[in-house]
Amino acid sequence: MPQLVRYGRELIRISARGIEFSTNDGRSWLTRYTGSSCGTFMDLLLYGNELLAVTSKGVYFSTNEGRSWLSRYTGSSCGTFLNLTDSGRELLANTSKGLYFSTNSGRSWLRR
């Protein structure tokens, strides 16, 4: 479950304070996002030009390196999201109800 991803020249990670970033390979960290509207961050995935996050409220995305987040999927039919994986052709989600996949960047999910 990646809680740290490389995004261009930065490392971005989940911390107890929210989302942090480093520009010196992790020697020091600065806070980037501390909002609570997304819930608690649990997993990060770089997916194309977006940073995806599994949170306690669903799947969220950022197009600005984690400075702000928007809801991508908050439905309950899939159960609680645990982590995301890029399979190359589709997005996979391990949830409390099993394995789900998405072919539209996480906007909708089908059970595998």
Placement of each model-derived feature along the sequence:
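Blade-level signature of beta-propeller repeat domains, shared across WD40, Kelch, NHL, RCC1
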Residues: 94-112
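An edge-strand/N-cap motif at the start of beta-rich repeat modules
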Residues: 1-30, 110
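Repeated scaffold domains used in trafficking and secretory/extracellular systems
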Residues: 1-8, 38-47, 78-87
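Conserved Ser/Thr-centered positions that define the repeating blades of beta-propeller domains
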Residues: 22-23, 62-63, 102-103
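Entry beta-strands of beta-propeller and related beta-repeat scaffolds
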Residues: 4, 8-13, 50-53, 88-93
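Surface loop/turn motifs at the tips and blade-to-blade linkers of beta-strand repeat domains
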Residues: 33-36, 73-76
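Hydrophobic beta-strand positions in blades of beta-propellers and related beta-sheet-rich domains
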Residues: 19, 59-60, 99
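Short loop/turn segments immediately following the C-termini of beta-strands
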Residues: 16, 56, 96
